[in-house]
Amino acid sequence: MDFGALPPEVNSGRMYCGPGSAPMVAAASAWNGLAAELSVAAVGYERVITTLQTEEWLGPASTLMVEAVAPYVAWMRATAIQAEQAASQARAAAAAYETAFAAIVPPPLIAANRARLTSLVTHNVFGQNTASIAATEAQYAEMWAQDAMAMYGYAGSSATATKVTPFAPPPNTTSPSAAATQLSAVAKAAGTSAGAAQSAIAELIAHLPNTLLGLTSPLSSALTAAATPGWLEWFINWYLPISQLFYNTVGLPYFAIGIGNSLITSWRALGWIGPEAAEAAAAAPAAVGAAVGGTGPVSAGLGNAATIGKLSLPPNWAGASPSLAPTVGSASAPLVSDIVEQPEAGAAGNLLGGMPLAGSGTGMGGAGPRYGFRVTVMSRPPFAG
């Protein structure tokens, strides 16, 4: 544009009616902020990549990731530098505008010059204002030249300041065909999974009747390779060791409890635990003192032991042996109830369990008929009076 061909009213009016340098200053601030963000992002990328590659993620995948991200990090650093240059150029453009604005003649001065010229020309009846008119025209010419020079300088400075290096687009970090490959792989995997599931269900339905029929025969015939599907045989082979281990693990506490109960029963029968053992332990000091002191003579008896038939019983069996039930029809058999008093629930048993077979031979005592009809005598119940 030829600013010299334009009057000062146009050049000055354009400079004063525009938005000024505020947009360029704001643009410079924005470019500075973008450059700082890109620099921080590049540093963060490099730190994360270094940490993953040296401490947490090793192998071919890590190498491929670094190779894919390294160009992007380099692009961010280069773009940050270009953003800083753009900010500097925006500040230079704002400075050029301020310089041109300061050199431009203000529009009010130009308007005043034109008004004075009009007044001088109007009142120049006898030529008395000729010199003043010439001076006013010369002043206007100077304004014209000053505006033209300011606009030429501003055009040159702004042209240099606004030459921004074109920004390069970011590099691709993924393969362009990766999306299509991934979609095809997902579709193929979904189809394969669905087909495998349908095939497994069809195989299960086909072999289910044969398997159910094979359950009626021994297990070995049901597990033959000809009648059992491969997946069922694999499941059984996998499950049997686990079930045996589970059975052994769960049954081990019950085995220990059974051994403990057996030992407790044996010790109680032998009198090692229970009330008799406590009484024997309490009487032990007195027995020891009596044996040491020798306060009384040792006495013994002959023929005083309790008997069962013609057999003599040990002394500690006398209280535990049940009373012998008299034979039916004998002189000593009263017609009363044959219910005998049971031992206390808390009393400990012994090894022979209180001679449970002591009265089992009463039927062979010859009191009743050995063959044929046996006469049964019932005792009168207490509630009959």
Curated annotation (Swiss-Prot):
A Gene Ontology BP annotation from the UniProt entry: response to host immune response
Residues annotated as transmembrane: none
InterPro entries in the record: PPE_C, PPE_dom, PPE_sf
Family: Belongs to the mycobacterial PPE family.
Protein name listed in UniProt: Uncharacterized PPE family protein PPE22
Source species taxonomy: Bacteria, Bacillati, Actinomycetota, Actinomycetes, Mycobacteriales
